[in-house]
Structures are given as structure tokens and as C-alpha cells.
Amino acid sequence: MSTAVRIASTKKPAKYALIFLHGLGDTGQGWSFLAQYLQQYHPCFESTNFIFPNAPIKPVTANGGMPMPSWFDIKVWDWTTSNVDTVGFQQSLKEVQKYVDSSISDGIEPQNIIVGGFSQGAALALASAVTLNNKIGAFIGLSGFAYLRNELQETRKNLNPNTPVFHGHGESDDVVPFPIGVQTAEFFKSAGELENYTFKSYRGLGHSADPAELNDLAEFLKSNVYSKDA
């Protein structure tokens, strides 16, 4: 597996695991604040192991070939193109599976595992909803997009059709435009046949997250994954 920033549960034993994938050019450290944010939001999150994997360093074609942390190559700044890094995307999906398997090996029940991500990481997290070999607790996609749509439809696994999905997107996003977020949600609800899919938009929010979105995310997780402890 790739390296990761890990923040152990403050309440033992750990009962939950949240695996969160960062965006292009970032690292796991960039999203590690989410652990403290959720732990301070409600005590139910104190029994969570937080895992923030680091993407490998690789050249990104759309950035002039500059090496940077990236889960897969982005060849052009077009979120609907079929000209994508299929191999890199599928390799990163396998990494997600490894982190899920590792959490299960650590004693976390699959229904208490959450897979999420931001931007490039959200593309992987949402795709994991139709590719994982396990039925888990929830999926999170913040400012994400849908890559490899045809391939995902052809290889879709029907293990998480009712698993809760939280998908948030800023209406002022200038990196992954808001209409792409809407199209992504429609794709996963229709072609992906994900029946328990929550899509929320945030006025004035760009390509980032804000307290309104994070609070909605926390409430979503409390209701759908942590309900017996919240």
C-alpha cells in the first residue's frame, strides 16, 4: 500500500475507520484536520481510526508533465473526456481496496468503514461504490467527478446499491465546475444504480470545503453510520 497519515482513535477500542483520499497535488496531511474536526463535532467520532493515504508522485500531463502527488494522470482539463489514465485509475482503486482490507484485518467491521475523498480522491471514492469487493458503511465524494464511465458500467459490482453516499459540491467551483458535479451524481444514481445517494450543493463555495459542507457531512455520518453511538 501507499504511505498514509494515520490518526488513531482517541477512544479504545476503535470501532470505525474513515479512509479519505486527497486531491491532485496534495498529501494525506492536507486533509488530516478532518479527524480533529469530526472528533470535536461529536464524541461518536472518537472511536474512529482515520487514514489519509498519500498519492504517488507522478508526472501530470495536463500540468506540463510536472511531477506531483496524483492518484492518476490527468491528460486534459476535461472532466467528461474518455482520454483518461485507465491504468493509473484502476491501480488507485486497488489501493482503496487494500486500505479497506487492512481496516477489516485490524478488526473493524465492514459496515463501520467509510471511504471518501476530495476532487481527484472523490473520483476514486465514488467509483469505489461500484467496484469494491465489500459492502461498507458509507462513501463520501467532495468536489468530485466521474471517470471511466463506460468501464465502470461494464464492471460494476452490485455490493453497495443501498450504501449511503454523501456527495457535496460548491456552486462556484472553478476547477471541477458545478455542472460536472451534477452530472456525476446523475451518473452514479442511474448507471451506477446507487439508490441511497445524497447530493448537496453549496452556494459561493469554490474548489474546497467549508464548515457548512463539513457539518452536513458529519450529520450524514452520524445518521447513517454512527447512529448506534450518536
UniProtKB/Swiss-Prot annotation:
It comes from the Eukaryota. Its EC number is 3.1.2.-, 3.1.2.22. Keywords: Cytoplasm, Fatty acid metabolism, Hydrolase, Lipid metabolism, Nucleus, Serine esterase. It holds the Pfam family Abhydrolase_2. GO terms for molecular function: carboxylic ester hydrolase activity; palmitoyl-(protein) hydrolase activity. Transmembrane segments: none annotated. GO terms for cellular component: cytoplasm; nucleus. It is found in: Cytoplasm; Nucleus. It is an enzyme of class 3 (hydrolase). GO terms for biological process: fatty acid metabolic process. The active site is at S119, D173, H207. It catalyses: S-hexadecanoyl-L-cysteinyl-[protein] + H2O = L-cysteinyl-[protein] + hexadecanoate + H(+). The keyword Glycoprotein does not apply. Belongs to the AB hydrolase superfamily. AB hydrolase 2 family. Hydrolyzes fatty acids from S-acylated cysteine residues in proteins with a strong preference for palmitoylated G-alpha proteins over other acyl substrates. Mediates the deacylation of G-alpha proteins such as GPA1 in vivo, but has weak or no activity toward palmitoylated Ras proteins. Has weak lysophospholipase activity in vitro; however such activity may not exist in vivo. This is Acyl-protein thioesterase 1. It comes from Candida glabrata (strain ATCC 2001 / BCRC 20586 / JCM 3761 / NBRC 0622 / NRRL Y-65 / CBS 138). The lineage of its organism: Eukaryota, Fungi, Dikarya, Ascomycota, Saccharomycotina.
